[in-house]
Structures are given as C-alpha cells and as structure tokens.
Amino acid sequence: MKFGKQIQKRQLEVPEYAASFVNYKALKKLIKKLSATPILPPQTDLRRAPGEPLDTQSALQANKATFFFQIDRELDKVNACYVQKEAELKIRLKTLLDKKKALRSRSGGTSRRSTKFTTLQEGFQQFVNDLNKLQQFVEINGTAFSKILKKWDKTAKSKTKELYLSRVVEKRPAFNPTVISELSDQATTSLQELGAWADGDNVSFETRPDHDHVVSTQHLLGTDEGDADTLLLDTVLSGNIDSLKDMLDRMKATAAPDGSADVSLAERVTRTFLASINEGSLEALKVLLDTGLVDIQSWDDINERNCLHQAAIYGNSFVLEYGLSKGVDAERTDAYGRVPLHYASMHGRLDMIDALLNASPKTINLIDHDNFTPLVHSIVRNHLECVGRLLERSARIDPVSDTDHVPLNLACQHGSVAIVELLLKHGAKILADAEGLYPQHLVARSGQTPEILVLLKQYGADLDQIDKLYGWTPLVHAASEGNVPCLQALLETGADPNILDEKDLPAMYYAAWEGHLECMKLLTPAKKEKAASELPPIHIGGALPPMASSTAPMPMSLDAIDPIPALELPPPIIPLRRYGHNFLDTKTVVQISFEEDSEQPLLFFQDGKYPAARLTISSKSSDLIPKNIILPFQEDTRVASFQIDNLESFTLDFEVFPTYGAKVIAKTVALPNIFRALLSSSGKCCLPLFDPRLRAIGQISFHVQIIKPFSGTPLEITDFETYWKATSQFDTNTSTFVTGSSLSGDFVQIYVQHTKDGVPVLWPRWTINCGGIDVPVSTLTLAQFQTVTAAARNRINLSELSTYTLDQIADVHRILANIGITLHEALFLLPKGMHVNIQVLYPTADEKAEAKSSTAADDVNEFADAILSVVFDHARAQRAERPDSVRSVVFSSYNPTLCTALNWKQPNFPVFLCNDMGREDRKQQQQGSCSKGDGDEDMGGTTAASRREAADERTLQSDGRRTSSIKDVVRTATSNNLMGLICCSRLLDMVPALVDAIKSHGLALVVDKSGEPEAANSKDSGDKQLGISGALGGLAGSDPFPKLPKGVDGLLKSNGVLRFNEYIDV
C-alpha cells in the first residue's frame, strides 16, 4: 500500500488523532514546489546572471531552511499531541490501579459478578486499546518523517535524513518507547491479576512491592462495604423480592443520625442498580427505584456509562423509558465516545432508536472513537430495519470529510445486499474510501455476495473503475483474492479482463501469482479474445536517461533519477558470480512454518481477551538469535529457521507479548522429543499456551521441517568445482537478475524414486503393473522391483547404452524411463559426457495419506542422503577414470521439501523446484500416460522398436506433479537458495509478466514443455502460436531448440531433453 494511503487509513481508524498526523502530502508538495520555483538564490551562485534559472539541487539547497522549518512545525504538532495523550493515559492508569488496590482489600474473594470487577476489567482493556492507538500514532508518524526526509535527500542530493532523525526526531518524548512499554506492562499485569483474583487466587504479578498509600476513589472504604455491595447485588439477581426488601429495610435502619450512612447507602444502591440492569428482574429494579435512593442521573466512574447506555446495551426498555422520563442525558458519551443511540443501533434495538432520537435528534450523526456513526454500527452488524429507520430520520448517508467512513462501502464490504440496495435507493453516492477503494472493489475483494456487483452497475457504478490504491479494477481484486463467484459475475457483466494496473499487469497475472486455478480458467477464454503479443523484453539494466536540460527549471518527480550523479562508486559492470550456495556441514536446520490450514496458527480460547500482538521464538542455545514476529502473521513472517548443533537437546520457547511491552501474556515450549518423534523429519505440532498461572488459554500450531547434514562423505570443494550463477543489480533499489550460469548444453532427464529399503531406482510413476495389479514402488524391496522389471531389462542390451552419442539423448531418455534399474546403474551406463537432470519423485503428505503407504524410506533426509551418496560416488569414480571430465548433474522435483533437503545438504549441484500450474487437462494426460500401452505393458514381449514408436506418438508423463502458486514456489526457492524454477510453458504463455517476476528474485527460469506432444510444436499445427509458445515453436524441419526468449534460461522438452542457454556474460 502506498504510504500516503496508509496514513489516510490510519487517520480513519484513530479519528481523535487525525488532526495531529504529519501532513505528509503537503510536505511532498512542498519539496516539489521548492525544487521548481526557488525563492532565494543560493549563496554559492552569487555571480549568476539575473533571470538565469536555477537547477533543482541548487534550488532545494537555497530553500533548505524553508523545508526544515515546516518539518519542525510538523514535529512539534505530533509531539504536543503525544505529550497530552500520555499525560491523560497516566492519570487514567493511576485511577485504575487505585481502584484495583481497593478492590483487593476485601477479605473475601473477588467475584466475577461484582460490579467493580466487571467495570474495572473493562477499564483496563480499554486502556490497553487506547495505549495501542497512541503507539500506532507514534509509529506511523515516525515512518512519515523518515520517508519524507529520504525524499528530500534523494531530490536535493543531500545526506540529512539519519542526522535529523537521530538528533532531532528521536530526542522528542513522542519517540521514546520506554514510557509506553512501562504503561503497557502495568496494564497487562493488572489484567492478569484481576483474572486470578476472580478465580480465588490471591496472587500478585508485581515485579516489585509497592508500599505507597492506597487512596481509593470509590466508595469501598472497607471490607464490610465491599461485602455489602456484593451481597446486595446477589440478592437483586436472585429475584427474591421479599429478601431484597428486607435487606434494604435493615440497611436503612442502620443509618447514622448525621446522615453520612444515607449517602453511602444511596451510592451503594445506585451502583447496584446500574450493575443489575443486565440480569435483574423488572420487579427487583422497581424495588430499588422505590427506595428513592437511586441517583438515576449517575454514571459509572470507569466506563462512564449511565443507565441509558446500560439499557441500550442489554435491551432493558423499562430502564430506558424510566431514565428518559426523568431527564437522563441521552447525549452523554462513555469512555468509547458512544452515546446510547450508538448501542441501540449496534444491538438492533429498533424501538429504542425511536425513543432516543425523539429525546435527542442531534445524536443521529455523532461519531464515536472508532469513527462510527449509529448508521455505520447498524450496517456492519447487518440490522436492516435499524438502517431503514435511521435513514427515515435523515441520518447522513455520505461522508463529509476524508476521515469519515463511507456507509455504502462498508455495506458492500460486509456483503449485505438488502442494505446496499436500501442505501442506493436513498441516494448514496459511489465514492472511494480512505484507501482509495470504491464499493465495487470492496465487493470483489471480500467475495461474499456477487449480486451486489450487478446492483451497483444498475445504479451507475463502473465495473472497470480503477482504484486509487494500486490502480486495480474490481476484476483484479477478485482474481487476486480467488473470489470465483465475483470474478464470474464481473465477466458476465462485461468487465474487461485485459485492463492493466499501474505496473502494467493484468488480472491473470495476480490469479497465477496467488495460485487461483479456477480464476485462471475463467480468465483464459477472455484472454484469448485479445491477440497475444510477443514476450516483452526483460530490462535487466539500461542506459542512463537523457540529461535534463539545465537551461530552464522544471518540476521534478520525487521518484525520478537525477541526472547529476552522486559522489558514489558506480555499480560493477561485470555481473557478480555466486559459487554454490550455503549448505549444512555439521549443523541441522529446523524450519518452523505457520500456515493457515483449517484454523489460525495462534488461537486464544477467549477471543479478544488477550491483546496479543507479538510472538517471540527463542531457544536456550546462546548462538541463536530470537525471532520476533508481529501478529497477525504476514507472508514474509510465516517461516522461522534455526541452525542448531544438536537436535537431542534442542528446545524452542514460544512467548506471546502485548503490542508494546515486555510482560508475557502466554508461553509454551517445544521439547526435544517433539522434534525427534516427527515422522519423515516433518510434521505438524500443536502446543497449548499457558498464562503466568499455568492455565491453558490458547494454542499455537505449526509445521516442522528438519533437515540434517549429509550423513555420508561429501564431495571435496577443492577437488570438485561447484556450479555458479551470475547476477546483476544495477542499483540498490532494483531486483537481482540471473544473467548467466555454469549450466549449458543438453541434459537427459531421468525419474528417480525409492524402494521400500531406501534404494533410489528409475521409474516415472508411483505404481508399477505386476500381474494386472498396480503396486506402489515404495512398497517393493529392490529385489522385488528388479523381479518385476526383469522382462524389460532383458529386451535391451544395456551395455550398448554407453555407446549412444549425444545426438541420441532423447532415445536414452525413453530407454531409461521404462527400464527399471537403480540410479547407480543408470549413471554408469550413461554415455560419457552426457549430462543428467535427476527428476526426483517424492510424495507429499497428502499423497502419502491417499496412497496409505508409509515406509522407513519415507524420511526425506534418508532418501536425499541415498541419492546424494550415489551421485557423489559416481562423481569420484568418474574423476578417477577421467580427471579432465565430470558429468554435470541437476536435481529437480515437484516436492518443495525434497528440494530444500537436497539443496541444504550439498553445494555442488543446483536444484530446481518444479511447478505444474497452467498445464491443460493435466489429470487426463496423466491418466492417458498411465494406461495400458504406455510402458507397463512392456513387461510383456513388446520389442524395443515398437516401444520407441509408441513413445513417439505419446508424451511420457511422470507422477508426482504438483500445482502451487507462483508466490509460494518463489518464496520457497529464494528462502532456501535454490537455483531456480521449472514452470509450465502454457502458464508463461498466458502470463508473460511472470518471467520478469520470477527473474527479479534472482532465480533461473526453465520452461517446461514436457506435457506437450511433439506435433503440437510443429510448423504444420493449425494455429500460429505467439509469446513463449511461438518463440519455442517451429520444430518440424528446423532446429528443435531455437533460441530461447529473453529471460528464459532453459527448455525442458517432451522428449526428456533439458537444454540450457549457452552462457553469455552481459
């Protein structure tokens, strides 16, 4: 989100601070104005001829004092607001702490039904919320100062940001986090103590004793007073009218002659009346009122609610009518800035809305501390009748300022068709909210009721409207969020799927990036209507823009590159070569990932009671840095990785803290046996969260992946060269692109999986036909597997395989794909100098569960070690035989866990993660490839020639293919230093912009055309193919490997040949 929109959204969320935010937009305009129209001539240019214009940098330097004068005033405004709010919060906290101490002074336990307990607990929770708002105000303004100073430095070519922040901004009280942290800790401690006292545990979580004199601001002057309050409330709630009258009579009889007891009694009865509005019977409330001791005008001194607030919250019509008849103020606001009408609208009290508006009509448009009017409260809680009544009473339907909520937008966001239609009938305008989103964007993003889109169009909404946030249309929002019904409704109403956003990306790009297959299917026919274009070139770098004219001043864009170079060294012209990657020598990697499966990763049993905002993951190991994760989890914070020395003694502590503070809310620990007991070195774990009193108050769930170092003897780095890749980064703000690598030439693809006893064997499918029954390969031992495949091996003289030339690499692939031998045998049978791409088939957890098979060899570490041992032994043997030549090896797999393990265990060979997203009719192709006649029938007497002829007519498809979002595979590849990705050519043809997106993360890209028959790429095929398909087409009668499109590093063909570009150092 753009920072300017972010500030506007935050102003909407905390309206009481809105006027004190940094005027970020005005400061940006000021920089632009000062750079274009200088006020003062620079002192260094006194001999400049009159009328001669100034260049941008000189103009800004001349007006430096003007800019920083304005910055200082903005800083004063922010700091003054903070100092005032901090003082108010300190006073509130002292009052709450005094009340808590007085509450604790009772000899009996504190009941949850106690009047003061409930209001005091609510008071502390409200204090925490207000404290969080203050800290958010400080954070967003601190970011604003940092960003605007960065823009100034960039435009003026100066270095003032860090100096000004450290010497001016950070010296102000507003940017000292210590005070807010201490206040947060005190409030969190008090909430924990209140909960303990209510359960009968007289404990204290104070870090130090406090011997200060307790000054109570409430009328609980002693134990007897507190007990009397509780006893009277219990009697009222019991509904025993006779006992209640008798108790009140006895209380009146004890009145002192001077009348002091009458005042105390009246306050006690008033407190009891307010507390019993919720559950007290009508008769009991009347008894209290008949005593004449109830001060009907009073309000609670913590939440500041009077009887009208309480009646509206709990739906007590009798109290509301009685209070209004006695002249109780209907305009009084409570601690949340709400009047009784807010609560009546919030809870759908239609009759109360009429009564309150008759008593005070001007409250209809009052806003509370959440910037909600009564109408907005009714909308977000879907109270249709209340919305209608408020509109009849002329409630404001459109915002009056940028900091107001837009009722129509909120109704669209919450998916109420009836309320949206009602608002539109009353003339609601189609407006953008503080984020720059129109109603149609919110409907498409939330995806609840696509019918609203049709309704909005009937009232004049443009369904191709571009928002002011990202430049997205509603169609892009629906595609990005995977909202299929909304996407379908938009397409049916004629929305244009080819509109590009501000990054020149279509809706299809975001659907593919997020992995929404159904959305991609809907967008594909619409995309075909527009002629495809050639793959756009990838701009890895480029020439400097033309020098700006110095003869005339011009307004300068803040984001433009200045023509005058800074006094810094230029970036290197030669791309940086990176040899190999980080790998495990003796350490073990433990990866913790928090994925949202069926439930939230971190869950409290009483939602809203514990204001958790920060998770800290730490270990007792001194060399491990704790991981701090801001909640809720974001895409870039869902994975935490630790490298440890010993898994046997490894523990992880999970601690949950409030937003700003160091007081632990909840804690748990993962013991070593949890990690040791994981099947296949991976699994899911769920741990209880305990509060300081060791009560389970929630749970935390996460996936664990353990990667151990290679158990065998690795290849020596000094004897065996690692692969390398060259990357270019032309400035610090651009992404890193792979411009070349040591991978070149042709690689034969072989499919490897494991047997029951953990031996890597060659077979492209999970099952093998044995006597008409498909048996999983992983359930067979090596001896059993060799018995089943013996007939196929007997048909071919395997010794002749080593005599094949490099031009026969496709024949080698076909032979090895259905011959059923071990990986060890295959590597020694391959012709000298023929490189190999080892495609590893390893089932995911879902595939294992579906196959109902689990063997000892399923452990990813054992299987990866078995493969690497074979490859390493072959490399050593080949080096001993021919020191000048070593076979190049590439690993690839659709399983991200296996790719991660293979990459962490060695630095010598690159690893590619495959993704099958975008392949057309993938399941049908797999079924066809596994049917009779595709390889299993070769166990009979079919000749090698007939098998080769049949293979020419069909495309061999392996099992284990997996579809993932581009976002997920890119994140996995970059976080684990993989070489790159292998993606389906059809996907890249539909969304060419994905090439740029993948390459910008420093990943190599291979186009996978293995799912397409050879005939589909011939010149004789019916339709001319464009984009990647066109660039890779023309196979009949021409070079089967034409020059790859720019940005593509390799091509995987259906004949099992992987070809990389010849390396050119750019």
UniProtKB/Swiss-Prot annotation:
State the superkingdom. Eukaryota
Which Pfam families does the UniProt record give?
Ank_2, C2_GDE1, GDPD, SPX
Q: Where is this region: Disordered?
A: 923-963
For the biological process aspect of GO, one term held by this record is: lipid metabolic process
Q: Where are the ANK repeats?
A: 268-298, 336-366, 370-399, 403-432, 435-465, 470-499, 503-532
Q: Where is the SPX domain?
A: 1-166
Composition-biased stretches, type Basic and acidic residues, lie in 946-962
Q: Does the keyword Cytoplasm apply?
A: no
Question: Which of UniProt's keywords are assigned here?
Answer: ANK repeat, Repeat
Give a yes or no for keyword Repeat in this entry: yes
The record's CDD domains line, in alphabetical order, gives: GDPD_NUC-2_fungi, SPX_PHO81_NUC-2_like
Which residue ranges does UniProt annotate as crossing the membrane? Answer: none
Q: What protein name is recorded for this chain?
A: Ankyrin repeat protein nuc-2
- State the species of origin: Neurospora crassa (strain ATCC 24698 / 74-OR23-1A / CBS 708.71 / DSM 1257 / FGSC 987)
Lineage, opening ranks? Eukaryota, Fungi, Dikarya, Ascomycota, Pezizomycotina
